[in-house]
C-alpha cells in the first residue's frame, strides 16, 4: 500500500495499481478497451509528436485594421522620359519629374521645407518639379529629397521617443559618451536597464510614395532610389528593408525605422474580442515606427489605365493627352514637325481626334502665347500627378468605408499597407473568417459559462480562440506545399476546330465562376493523422466500387486531396470536354487517357466517377484528409456580391469597382506561388543568413552589382593627380634613416620599435661605406644617356611611330560613388532543400475552387453531350462546342438549342442564385450568352468564325436572334501576343488560307503575316539579359501570325478531339511507369524513363525456367534486375 498526494494536494492511500498502455496514435492511456478519436489523434500527430507540423502550419493572423495614432504623408509623382541611342539599344531616361504633397498638414509643411532646400526645384500650381535632360540628374535630386525625408523623420522619431524617456536617455548619453541620443545603440532600447514608457497618443508615421505604373516603369528608371546610406540614419532606431523584384516589377521597396514599444502586451485578454471587431489598440503594436512605402495605384486598380481608373472611380478630374514622340524628338534633337500653328502634326498623336481639343485648351489657358511643347508636357505631367493623387485618396477613403460598412468592422483600414488587390482581399477574408469563428465559438460556449464537467473532479474550461490564427485553417508547409500544388490545375483553353467555321456560333460564359465556386464548401480543420487518412481512403474506395453515382455532398465523404489512378470509360461514353487535365509530357493537356499517380481533390474524384471513369485511390503517405466541410469563403463573397448589387442600384461606381475586384482576386490570393529564392542587398544580410551560407544550407546563386549615372558620386581625373614619383610624394611614403630635417613620427602607444633603427633600410649611402661614390651612379648615368638618345626608328614614309609623350596622355575620368559596396551589391539566395516555408496561404482552398469549377463544367458537358453518349465519339454528327476558354464555351447551333432546352435552368435570370445554399446542397452556377444585342438585349451569334490557336480567334459579326430585331453588330477579335488594333477578321482568314497553301505544298501568293509593336524591355536583375540592371529599353517586337502548331489534341476529319487510349498523347507514349519498391520514401519524385532498364537474354531464360519448372524439383531462386 502506498500513500501519495492527489491533484488537490490531499494525502490519499493507494490500494491497488493497474498497468496501463499508451495509444501510439492519440496518446491516450487505457486499461481494457480503447478507440481513438479523430480530432485527438490529429492533435497528437501535429502538436505533440510534431510530425504534422513539418507538413502543415496554422494560418497566421494579424488584424489588418490600421494602428491608432498614425499620421500619413503622401508623395505623388510622375515622370516624363526621352530615349537615347546607346551601345545596347534605345534606353529611356527621365528628364522631368513632377510631384505633389498631401496628407497630415504638419507633415506636409515639414516635407515642403525639406524639398525647397534644393535650389533647382521649381513650383507649378500646387506641385513641384525638376526639369533636366542630363541622364540621371532628375533621379539624383529626387533621391536626395527622399533621403532628407528619411533622415528627418527617423531623427524626429528618436527625439520624440527620447523626450518620453528623458532620464534614461540622458543617463545613457552620459555613461556611453554618445554625442546625442541618435548615437545610442538600438539594443539599449530593445533591452533597457530600466522601464520605459510612451504616452498613449505617441504617433507613428507612414510616408507613401505614390504613382501610377511606377513599379514597372518610374521606380526602375529612378534606379538611385535603391541605394541607401545606412551611416546617415540614427543608430537608435533599427532600419529594416523589404525588397522584392518579381515578374518584371518592383513589388516591394519599403524601408521602416522602428523602436520598441514599451506599451506592448504579449498576451492581452481583450485582444481576441477587439480584433474580432476590427479594432487595434496601442498595446498591440510591437514597435513604433516611421515607414516609407512605394505603392503603385495600377496594382490597386487591377491594372487599369489611369484614364479608365479615373472613370471607374468617378473622379472629377480626367487625364490629358500628350504627343510622346514629338516630345522625345524635341528633347533628343531640339526640334519636331509642327503645323502652321506650331502644334505637333497628326502622326505624333495616339488619337488624332483630340488635336482640335488640345489646341483650344492651349489657347484658352495661354491666350496669345506661342505653343511651347515643354510647357505643355509639364502641365500634362502635373495633371497626371493631380489625377493620381485624387485616385489615391479616393482609394484610401473608399476601402476604409468598405471595411466598416460592408464588413461590419469598427476600426479603420489603410489600403496602402499592402501593395496589391490580392493581398488586400486576402487580409479582408482572414479578418471576416476570424470574426465569424470567434462568434461561433462564443455562441457554442460563452466565456462566462464554463463547460459542464464530464467526470468528477476539476471543471474543464473551454479553450478560447487564439488571436494569432485564422479559425482552423492550415497552410501546406515545406514538402506538403509542393505536393498540394500538384492538384492546382489550370483552366480549359483549346479549340476543337482549326480554320473558318461557316455556321452560327454562340458564346456562353459562366457568371462569376470563381466567385460561385468560392461559396461552396471548403476543407476545414486540422488534417487527420495517417491512420485515419488510410481508413478514409479504404472507405472511399469501397464507395467508388459499390455505388454508380455519388453526390458531392455525401456525408460519408470528407474533403481530401489524394493520389489516384483513373481509367476512362469506352469511347462511346467519352466527350470532347474531358473532366480533368494532366501535366504529363510537360504540357497541360485535357485528355481522356488513363491517369496514373495524379494528385487531385475529392471533388475531381467524384466528377470522374460520375462521368463513368473507374477510379482507385492509392495509399500514399502524403494523402491528406480534412475532418469537415465548411463554407469558409461564402460570407465574404456574398457580402461583395450584395455590395456590388447595392452599388448598381445607388449608381456608386467606386464601391461597385471595389467589390468586383475583391471577389475576383480572392482565388488568386489562395493560389499564390512561392519559391525558395530571396533577393536582398548585402547590407541587409542577417546573422542567420550568414550562418546558413557558411553552413551550406543556402547558396548565393547570383550577384548583381548596381551602377547607374543617377547614383551620387565624385568625378576623379587622373591627370590632375600628383606625380607619385616626385620628390614630395616620395617623402610622404619613405623616411631617410639619417635625415635630421625629417620629423620624428609620434611614438605608438604600444611602444613597439622604440630606439631600434639598425634594421631599417636607407635609400642613402651609409657613412662607413668602403667607396666614396655610389655604386649605382654609373648605372643611372648609363640609363639616362640611353633614354636621351631615344629609340631607333627608321625615318621616312614607312615610319609609323607614335611620338606622344607620357605627359600628353588623356586619362578617362573615374567616378567614385558615395555608397558602400554592400549597398550596391544584390545577392540572390536560394535554399538548397527547395522547400517552401508557408504559413500564409491555404493553397488547398484554391485546389478546391478549381475542383468545383470543373464540377460546373462537367454538368455543362452533360447538358451538351448527354444525348450523344452511346455513339462513338468519332461517329457523332459534330461537336456541340467548338472552343473552351477558362469559364466560357463557344457552342454550335445544336449546342445552343440544347442549352435552351436541357440547360434552361442554368441560364441566368434575375432570380438565379449564384451562391451556395447550405439548406439545399447542390451545385450553384449559371451562364449566359456573352455577346448581347445592343438594340434589344437578346442573344447574338456569329455567322462565321475562325479559330487559329488558343486565345487567337475571330468572330466576324454578332447577329441578333430576335426575328423582329436581327441587328448586325461588330464581331470580336482575340489575339493574345499580337497587337489587336492591327488585326481584323479578314487578316485572320488570309493567314489560314496561306497556311493551307503551304500545307499542301503550293506556292502561296499571300505573304507571311506578322504584327509589330513597340514594347518596353524592363530589366530588373535578370542574370542573362544583355541590358544593365534596372533599365528600360525600347524594342520593336515582331510576331508572326500563324495557326496552332504544337497541338494538344489529335485531328480526325474536320475537328480536333482530346487524346484517349486509342489515340495516346505522343509526348507520353515513351514514358515508363516504374512500380515503386516497398518502403520508397520519395512520393514527389518525377516519372523516370530508363531506356536501358530491360532484361538481358540470359535473364529472360532464367525467368522462363522459373515459370515452367516443376514446383517440387525447383529450388527457390532469386533474380535481381
From Swiss-Prot:
It is an enzyme of class 2 (transferase). It catalyses: DNA(n) + a 2'-deoxyribonucleoside 5'-triphosphate = DNA(n+1) + diphosphate. InterPro entries: DNA-dir_DNA_pol_B (IPR006172), DNA-dir_DNA_pol_B_adenovir (IPR014382), DNA-dir_DNA_pol_B_CS (IPR017964), DNA-dir_DNA_pol_B_mt/vir (IPR004868), DNA/RNA_pol_sf (IPR043502), DNA_pol_palm_dom_sf (IPR023211), RNaseH-like_sf (IPR012337). PROSITE patterns: DNA_POLYMERASE_B (PS00116), PA2_ASP (PS00119). Residues 739-759 have a biased composition (Acidic residues). GO terms for cellular component: host cell nucleus. Its main location: host cell. Residues 455-464 have a biased composition (Basic residues). Pfam families: DNA_pol_B_2 (PF03175). It is found in: Host nucleus. Heterodimer with the terminal protein; this heterodimer binds to bp 9 to 18 of the genome. Forms a complex with viral pTP, DBP and hosts NFIA and POU2F1/OCT1 for initiation of replication. Eukaryotic-type DNA polymerase involved in viral genomic replication. DNA synthesis is protein primed, and acts in a strand displacement replication. Assembles in complex with viral pTP, DBP, host NFIA and host POU2F1/OCT1 on viral origin of replication. The polymerase covalently transfers dCMP onto pTP, thereby initiating complementary strand synthesis. HAMAP family: ADV_DPOL. This DNA polymerase requires a protein as a primer. This is DNA polymerase. It comes from Fowl adenovirus A serotype 1 (strain CELO / Phelps). The gene is POL.
